[in-house]
A protein has these predicted regions:
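Bacterial N-terminal signal peptides
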Residues: 9-19
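Bacterial N-terminal signal peptides that target proteins for export
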Residues: 1-9
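Intrinsically disordered, low-complexity Ser/Thr-rich linker and spacer segments
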Residues: 121-140, 236-239
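N-terminal targeting/docking segments
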Residues: 2-3, 18-21, 126-131
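Central antiparallel beta-sheet cores of small beta-barrel/beta-sandwich binding domains
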Residues: 24-100, 106-112, 116, 131-215, ...
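Positively charged, low-complexity intrinsically disordered regions
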Residues: 6-7, 23-25, 53, 125, ...
Length: 239
């Protein structure tokens, strides 16, 4: 009887320890999150996708007004604390905490412009959703490489970097980055190259470039369109 009693006590202790350890392990923030940033008179609907890695960081994207799948920066996950930055016009830093049940992520959003601090709350609604890398038809060698341009908007000059490359499998890929808004590389969603004419779509920011490459292959001259906004944009090949 004593042996049986001792066995039960040991088993109870082990189970108790296991439960304690499990309770101390925070939930994984990986997943698709939906919610809003709360302003005094309105709520701005947003969606965030996170995929945690083993080093306290991870991969993430942001979707909101006129933005879908914009890459997040500075992702940091420490226990229940989760932080990330949206490096875009109107963006800012998110700092939040994961609820014990792993279903809610809430905290504060600090806007880049004005430094306003606003509450946000997100609810988990499934697995993280990331678009597969886009592969377009092969482009001419005159388009391959890195291109630099300057876009004028509301009296501000923004430096734009465009990268286009052919891949070994016969496809092409591209990215666009605003060097004055965090230099985040946004994937190009479509590249069309017919003779000298070039069309580049950037679905993430609902933007597109339509233009032509010169005979020397040193300039791309055209127009950038994003919603109702249009402006001339000329890229020069980087040496």
């Amino acid at each position: 009887m004593k042996t049986g009693h001792r066995t039960l006590l040991v088993a109870a202790a082990v189970l108790s320890t296991t439960s304690f350890l499990r309770a101390q392990s925070p939930a994984d923030p990986s997943g698709h999150w939906q919610g809003a940033i709360r302003m005094p008179n309105q709520a701005i609907a947003i969606e965030v996708d996170l995929d945690r890695n083993t080093t306290g960081g991870g991969k993430g994207t942001f979707s909101g007004v006129n933005i879908k799948g914009y890459p997040l920066s500075d992702i940091a996950i420490d226990g229940a604390a989760v932080a990330f930055t949206l490096k875009v016009d109107g963006g800012g830093a998110f700092s939040g905490k994961l609820a014990a049940d792993g279903k809610v992520l809430s905290g504060e959003f600090t806007a880049n412009s004005g430094g306003y601090v606003l509450p946000f709350e997100l609810s988990r609604s499934g697995e993280a959703k990331f678009d597969a890398p886009v592969k377009n038809p092969r482009i001419g060698k005159e388009l391959e490489g890195t291109w630099s341009g300057a876009l004028e908007a509301n009296g501000t000059t923004m430096r734009i970097l465009l990268k286009l490359a052919n891949q070994p499998d016969g496809t092409s890929t591209g990215s666009l980055a605003n060097l004055d808004q965090g230099a985040v590389e946004i994937p190009v969603s479509a590249i069309t190259h017919t003779a000298a004419n070039v069309n580049i779509d950037v679905k993430v920011v609902s933007g597109s470039f339509s233009g032509a490459v010169n005979a020397a292959g040193t300039e791309l001259t055209g127009t950038w369109s994003q919603g109702a906004f249009t402006a001339p944009l000329t890229f020069h090949r980087d040496k």
